[in-house]
Amino acid sequence: MLTLTLLLYLSFITTVFSKKVIYEAENGKLDGVSKYNELQGYSGTGYVGRFESAGNSVTVTVEVSQTGMYDMSIIYCGNMGQKINSLKINGKNSGDITFPENSSFEELNIGAVYLNSGENTVSLVASWGWIWIDALVVNDTPNVAKDVSPHINPTLVNPKAIPAAKKLYDFLRSNYGKRILSGQVGGAGQAGDEGQEIQRIQKATGKLPAVWNMDFIFESNDCTWRPENPDITEMAINWWKKYQGKGIMAAQWHWNIAGKTGDFAFYKKDTTFSIDNAVTEGTWEYEKIIKDIDRVAGHIKKLQAVNMPLIWRPLHENDGDWFWWGNNPKSCAKLWKILYERMVNYHGLNNLIWLWNGKNDANTPVDYIDIIGVDIYANDHGPQTTAYNTHFDFYGGKKMVVLSENGRIPDIQQCVDQNAWWGYFQTWNSEFILQDSYHTDAQLKEYFTHKTVMNMDELPSFNVNSYEYQSGNNNNNSSNNNNNNNSSECFSIPLGYPCCKGNTVVYTDNDGDWGVENNEWCGIGNSSSAVVCWSEALGYPCCVSSSDVYYTDNDGEWGVENGDWCGII
């Protein structure tokens, strides 16, 4: 992707209107761009363009009387199509800006930016170039700092959310605007993998990230290869039990479809799969996505069976055109609603917190979204304030905004200073966390031990059986864990789980036999009468009388009773 640095050093102020100060681009220092005056509607004596080659730039210096957040806008013409450009303030990345296609010069509000008292360099960094810039407009009076927490929606969009999901959402909401949670993405298809990424963080900082991210990348039906045991769900359950519910798990789904060459793929260039057809009932594409959703839902049911909430990020980065579900706002919003309806209302998955990571426009399914995610891979540790404000303001301050993916961790102190309250950051795996070119040990220690950052050791347990939403109170120190420990003593008590009243085994590990009661794991004492009912962990009952096998998969043999699947034991 062509990256053009448009370093705007405008040498002087040309016009002052009320509180708005206009900096004419054509009066700046130009490098590789030219002045033009053919288009109508520009201010001053012209405009600059077209930013065709790397290194092209126009430079402006903005001077303000006091440090603070200043509203800024750019007057541009985008008659060469929609372009995405980035903004730099004093050499630090502040975020990406989408310039919609238009036919004449318009003023685009890009939100508030942090400026120091005195001179500041403002840089417009174009990812795509090919745009006309007329002027930069800055308010000469700083804004009052935003109070981000009071207006966040107090409840999840799913009214049937399980107590564990409610508690997690309340915890995130009560800390929003006060703390930033640390996060890390594991290897592809991994869940809670304490591999090289976690080892690097722990060695450099002595901390474990609060949020861990997994990927259902290999769980579509078209995948012809999957990792060997343990599977992703088993890994997640082991992680949940190891930390006794004190971690936060997030997940995306690189949704693989049959590719052009007979393999599977999620990139648009590698498949002919049509999202428009996929959201149209009666098509084979529609039937295909329903089967895929059902398969992934089966995995998430296992997480719900152990009372694990999940921050769920399907259809991620849908504002781009690289994935087959991307750059099609209407159909993508429709697919999102299909996912929600199928998972929540059909499969009864009430452990999900729905994170939207994509395009913000009139099509955005706002009523089906809990949290907003932004993915940013910057070439420095800037706070990405403009990107934060753009997303926060679009939702009227009612939804938390997080860095659902980042390359470099933003400078935490700058985030605090500039009121860029990312709910959490979540660094991508491999070189992004392992190589010093992205993060040195000193930087990792600085960020993970910053007083604003919350790591795993500060989390409460989210494994609860009952919970009511709080009115913005910080529940950081509250347990709310209503496990029934009055049952007869068994191996699970020291692990933080109650004893089962019954004897139906749904899972066995080195600790012993586990059952599920009241949507929570419980330990089964040694009993020769234990009944192994593996299907309950998948959300299906055991067969009572039927022994006819209708279907066999990796989980076991399935029968049918009362019009529903049941597990044969």
Curated annotation (Swiss-Prot):
GO terms for biological process: substituted mannan metabolic process. One of its GO terms (molecular function) is mannan endo-1,4-beta-mannosidase activity. Substrate binds at W284, W322, Y377. It catalyses: Random hydrolysis of (1->4)-beta-D-mannosidic linkages in mannans, galactomannans and glucomannans. The keyword Repeat applies. Residues 1-18 form the signal peptide. Residues 163-457 form the GH26 domain. The keyword Nucleotide-binding does not apply. The active site is at E317 (proton donor), E405 (nucleophile). Its EC number is 3.2.1.78. It holds the Pfam family CBM_10. It is an enzyme of class 3 (hydrolase). SUPFAM superfamilies: (Trans)glycosidases, Cellulose docking domain, dockering, Galactose-binding domain-like. Keywords: Glycosidase, Hydrolase, Repeat, Signal. Residues 21-139 form the CBM6 domain. Residues 489-525, 532-569 form the CBM10 domain. PANTHER family: GH26 DOMAIN-CONTAINING PROTEIN-RELATED, MANNAN ENDO-1,4-BETA-MANNOSIDASE E-RELATED. Belongs to the glycosyl hydrolase 26 family. This is Mannan endo-1,4-beta-mannosidase C. The lineage of its organism: Eukaryota, Fungi, Fungi incertae sedis, Chytridiomycota, Chytridiomycota incertae sedis.
